[in-house]
């Protein structure tokens, strides 16, 4: 049975283990646990930080524990003292990404009168700014048991609230935002396509009347 992200294997296992709070239990949980990076010991945080840089520089296909060890200037076994497997390290990266998005979503929920539109724009911008981490998070199978407890839930809760607790609407907005974002990252649109116009049209179609979510046909200044 593999350890969770940041959990050491063998002697001293659990020294870097994420703190388990109410996050895994209920809706209020994600807000009660520390941010992902704060749940690692300093050496594990350094590994995650450098791993993220390596991922963005070279992509997932070239990402390996050996390449990471080279960049850190250590031998691979040093990494395995903090992350039991490559899958555990990948899950740590994904957890950090979820919590970064969650913080942005939570801010939009309190600062925007069109929170669902604002969150969708944040989601797209996050993918553009972190393309390989985004692909890691959303374009491959997700090993949920390895995630830091509460990280995925924390990113989901603001979107559901922005959709007026309508989970179907929240899922539809996510599906649209992901489809546009991943196609854009993979250069699948014609070079002359007006993606901002398509984005506004798609978001408006989710709630043509404006509705309780505050979506409008005009979008939210994303062009």
Regions found by a protein language model. Give the residues of each.
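Hydrophobic alpha-helical connector segments
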Residues: 92, 106-133, 151-156, 170-173
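Key DNA-contact positions within bacterial/archaeal DNA-binding proteins
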Residues: 77-78
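Basic, helix-initiating cap at the start of DNA-binding domains
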Residues: 1-58, 65-71, 88-91
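Amphipathic alpha-helical segments used for helix-helix packing
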Residues: 124-146, 182-190
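Hydrophobic alpha-helical segments that form the core
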Residues: 3-6, 125, 166-188, 194-206, ...
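Amphipathic alpha-helical packing segments from all-alpha helical-bundle domains
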Residues: 138-174, 193-208
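C-terminal regulatory/oligomerization modules of transcriptional regulators
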Residues: 1-29, 154, 179-187, 212-223
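An amphipathic alpha-helix adjacent to DNA-recognition modules
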Residues: 41-52, 56, 61-62, 73, ...
């Amino acid at each position: 049975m593999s350890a969770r992200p940041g959990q050491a294997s063998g002697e001293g296992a659990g020294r870097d283990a994420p703190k388990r709070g109410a996050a895994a239990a209920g809706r209020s949980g994600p807000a009660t646990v520390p941010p992902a990076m704060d749940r690692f010991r300093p050496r594990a945080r350094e590994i995650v930080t450098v791993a993220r840089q390596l991922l963005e520089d070279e992509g997932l296909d070239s990402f390996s524990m050996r390449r990471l060890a080279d960049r850190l200037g250590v031998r691979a076994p040093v990494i395995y003292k903090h992350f039991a497997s490559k899958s555990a390290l990948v899950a740590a990266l994904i957890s950090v990404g979820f919590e970064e998005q969650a913080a942005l979503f939570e801010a939009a929920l309190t600062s925007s009168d069109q929170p669902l539109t604002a969150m969708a724009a944040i989601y797209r911008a996050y993918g553009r700014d972190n393309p390989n981490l985004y692909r890691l998070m959303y374009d491959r199978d997700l090993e949920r048991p390895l995630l830091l407890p509460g990280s995925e839930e924390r990113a989901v809760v603001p979107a559901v609230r922005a959709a007026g607790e309508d989970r179907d609407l929240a899922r539809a907005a996510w599906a649209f935002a992901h489809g546009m974002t991943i196609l854009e990252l993979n250069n699948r649109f014609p070079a002359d396509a007006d993606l901002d116009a398509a984005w506004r049209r798609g978001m408006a179609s989710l709630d043509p009347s404006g509705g309780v979510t505050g979506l409008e046909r005009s979008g939210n200044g994303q062009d």
